Amino acid sequence: MRTWSTEYNILDMRIIKVNACHSIAEQPLCERAQTATIGFFDGLHKGHRKLIGDVVQASLRNGTESMVVTLDRHPSVLFCPERQPRLITTAEERIGLLAETGVDNCAIVEFNSLTASLSARDFMRRILKTQLNVSTLVLGFDSRFGHNRTEGFEEYRAYGREMDVDVRQDVALTNDGDVISSSSIRTMVGEGNVERAASFLGRPFSIRGVVVGGFQQGRKMGFPTANIRVPDDVLLPASGVYAVWVEIAGCQEVFQGMMDIGMRPTFNRCSLSVEVHILDFNADIYGKDVKLSFVSRIRREKKFDSVSELVNQLSEDEVMTRQMLSEELAPKRAK
């Protein structure tokens, strides 16, 4: 009996859930040979898309199916939760973005203590070769896997020869001379440089959350805001005011928004606030899921001497927001 192995379809991509406890004596999860790559793929940025595109093209030449092998959670969750990076994309977003690449299969490996204990050779033999029927493995320029990630491409290629797996290495993709990576995107977003992050991602950086109740300070000033609750492990941009696109669950229209992230120093608050003033909008959306796509940072967070001074600044921020968003195309809603 297979342990923790199920499948379902997202668009035309088959999802295969895999556990390291799968017995070698069992039938493989994939009958056809696979041309695959492996990684966590947080953000699914331009570099990831190039790698996966190369895998898809190689699979066509090889006469195999194409596959992405990924983990169900970031490895640091198990070993160093205090050092876990804030994620660019949630697991659901990551799988949805993978489905858009045209890859045939996505194998999601349950990351647990057994998986983490496997050497690179054992991972290739037990999971990639035996369970997933991988015949060609295309690795990213910095790809590392196996216990403690101590081995590299030459070792992987040698193990591949033992198992009749052709192991190849892709080249890095750069942007203005800088290598595109998830860690560099996290740094950019953390500094508020959402424009540069978008150039690495190939789309605006975005977050999702649920609209919850707040202190109503914005409404009292003439700038009502929707307070957004986001998952704790999601990456947030640096404090400040941003021009954003707002998508609301159940609504096909995409709205312009002025987003504020910060501690609300003018009101002496001590907790982080994530709220958006949706322009030309006045409806009750409490409890609704929203997606916020960041276009540009308007200004840094600032403490004002009075509420009236803050209101004047918000009026200027709104003018700037409208101007910036008028020069950008709104994202297309999925039908």
Segment roles from a protein language model:
Residues 86-94, 118-124:
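Glycine-rich, highly charged phosphate/nucleotide-binding loops
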Residues 114-224, 301, 305-311:
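Classical nucleotidyltransferase
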Residues 98-99:
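ATP-dependent adenylation/nucleotidyltransferase module used to activate substrates
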Residues 14-16, 106-109, 166-170:
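General small-molecule cofactor/ligand-binding pocket signal
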Residues 25-90:
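N-terminal catalytic cores of NTP/NDP-binding nucleotidyl/phosphoryl-transfer enzymes
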Residues 214-335:
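Phosphate/ribose-recognition catalytic cores of enzymes acting on nucleotide-derived substrates
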Residues 2-34:
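Positively charged, low-complexity intrinsically disordered leader regions
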